[in-house]
Amino acid sequence: MRQVAIYGKGGIGKSTTTQNLTSGLHAMGKTIMVVGCDPKADSTRLLLGGLAQKSVLDTLREEGEDVELDSILKEGYGGIRCVESGGPEPGVGCAGRGIITSINMLEQLGAYTDDLDYVFYDVLGDVVCGGFAMPIREGKAQEIYIVASGEMMALYAANNISKGIQKYAKSGGVRLGGIICNSRKVANEYELLDAFAKELGSQLIHFVPRSPMVTKAEINKQTVIEYDPTCEQAEEYRELARKVDANELFVIPKPMTQERLEEILMQYGLMDL
């Protein structure tokens, strides 16, 4: 079983990318569970046809400790198993703790079955605080992909996430598998992301072009592969799935200093001197 965490800044398209990637892996015959670790609890919406899934934390609040697995785990598109950890009530508690509670509960209830090829954790990545780092800190996820674009804030976040990975890689087995570019159609985007990934000692594993098909599929509450498996964008996600499945380049990243990051951004025209 490969346990994979997908990180990236809020709004970058992590959840969309994760759900389309897992649909691509399903097309390859893989058995998958997706665990949403974002308080927005939208990590599995497309796989479940738009059903707002009841989160682990909401279920715990309503039902107490006697929770059954089938009340927090739902099967979505292609039999992909879906769980949302959820978040605390706004202004109370810590969302990171919710992730810890959820993963522990899934383990107790026997969700990690032997037939699983992949478990994906879709994690909010602007803050690499202790709780959000849980999937990598506790040795749950062994490989990490960061979703980024050619925008400055996405790269700042990706560099920060790399610092978190570096910290926990020394004590555990977690490694960076690569950067996934979710294109924003920024000038020199491919070249910038490729240079950024290489600077970290990693790779740009796939460049996902921007496409109106993604929005169309989302309006229909589906992944692109389910909505129109014949379109070019569906093939992009299948290609991403093939690359992730075949990936063998796992590194402890070498995060950049602020100065070096800004140099790269200037080199590719994102920051004017």
Swiss-Prot record:
[4Fe-4S] cluster binds at C94, C129. The keyword GTP-binding does not apply. ATP binds at G8, K9, G10, G11, I12, G13, K14, S15. GO terms for molecular function: 4 iron, 4 sulfur cluster binding; ATP binding; metal ion binding; nitrogenase activity. Keywords: 4Fe-4S, ADP-ribosylation, ATP-binding, Iron, Iron-sulfur, Metal-binding, Nitrogen fixation, Nucleotide-binding, Oxidoreductase. CDD domains: NifH (cd02040). Its cofactor is [4Fe-4S] cluster. Its EC number is 1.18.6.1. Transmembrane segments: none annotated. The modification ADP-ribosylarginine is found at R97. The reversible ADP-ribosylation of Arg-97 inactivates the nitrogenase reductase and regulates nitrogenase activity. Binds 1 [4Fe-4S] cluster per dimer. It catalyses: N2 + 8 reduced [2Fe-2S]-[ferredoxin] + 16 ATP + 16 H2O = H2 + 8 oxidized [2Fe-2S]-[ferredoxin] + 2 NH4(+) + 16 ADP + 16 phosphate + 6 H(+). GO terms for biological process: nitrogen fixation. Homodimer. The key enzymatic reactions in nitrogen fixation are catalyzed by the nitrogenase complex, which has 2 components: the iron protein and the molybdenum-iron protein. HAMAP family: NifH. Belongs to the NifH/BchL/ChlL family. This is Nitrogenase iron protein 1. It comes from Clostridium pasteurianum.
